[in-house]
Every structure is written in C-alpha cells, then in structure tokens.
Amino acid sequence: MRCPYCQHPDSDVIDTRKLHNGETIRRRRKCEACGRRFTTYERVETVSITVVKKNGEREPYEREKLMRGVRTACYRRPVPAQALESLANDIEAELMALDEPEVPSSLIGDMVMRRLRTIDDVAYIRFASVYRSFADIGKLREAVDELLEQGR
C-alpha cells in the first residue's frame, strides 16, 4: 500500500482488526521508507446500484452521500460514529438483498428514517423535516406528535 506521506509504494501491516461484524477490515500500516504509520480500511465492493430520484434523474449510489445526510441529522447529538456506520452497513445490506439494479431514493429515505427513529428522536425529526419537505410548522408538529405518541 502506498504511503500517504512520502508516496513510497511499500508498507508493513502492523495490526489487523475486523469491524462491523467482519464486514470491514482495519489495518494499521507502517511505511518502510519514512516509518510513519497510517490506517487503511477494506470493505467488499458492492454491486453498483442506481438511485432513481423523485424527478426521475438517475445517479449512482454513494455511501458517502448517505453518511453526509445522516451525519447532518445527528449533528451535536449523542450518537456514536459506530451507530452511523452500522446504519449505513444495514441499509447497504438491505439494498443488496433486494437484488435490484435501480432503487427509488424514497426507499433509501424510508430505510434511513426507520433506523434513525430507533437511534435518536431529534436526529429522526431533523432528517424527516428535510426528507419529507414539511411545508409548514403544522406538518412538523404532526411528525413530533406521532413520535411522542409511539414512544408512550
């Protein structure tokens, strides 16, 4: 693996650990030339999925785009990064199980909302307010009331 610091092409693996139920491998490496250490992650490359947006536009599925939206919803909330990684892994596993080359963005949004609801109520409402495009405060209040009602 090429060193990100000095660009030397070879490095030694110092430590290897499985993460996310063995779906990801974390490796600590040491550059043979400069001696600096760095971390790499390995994950099985999934089959490409095309996301069909509400306006009919198609774009390739991007894990980072999903993570960005979830991180934004969880901003300054006590949600561990591991929970967000697990959420993304679960959604990707569910998408792969569908075995469909194209999935509507609404399906992914529903998957995110279902999982966020169990992780953090505030993050759920934040995500829902953008995803559902609440037109006014009344619609937002309905969502909060629904959440409170289900929590009882």
From Swiss-Prot:
Pfam families: ATP-cone (PF03477), Zn_ribbon_NrdR (PF22811)
Manganese listed as a keyword: no
Record flagged with keyword Lipid metabolism: no
PROSITE patterns assigned: ATP_CONE
Function, in words: Negatively regulates transcription of bacterial ribonucleotide reductase nrd genes and operons by binding to NrdR-boxes.
HAMAP family attached to this UniProt entry: NrdR (MF_00440)
Sequence similarity: Belongs to the NrdR family.
Protein name (record): Transcriptional repressor NrdR
MF (Gene Ontology): ATP binding; DNA binding; zinc ion binding
Species whose genome carries this gene: Roseiflexus castenholzii (strain DSM 13941 / HLO8)
GO BP terms, alphabetized: negative regulation of DNA-templated transcription
Keyword terms of this UniProt record: ATP-binding, DNA-binding, Metal-binding, Nucleotide-binding, Repressor, Transcription, Transcription regulation, Zinc, Zinc-finger
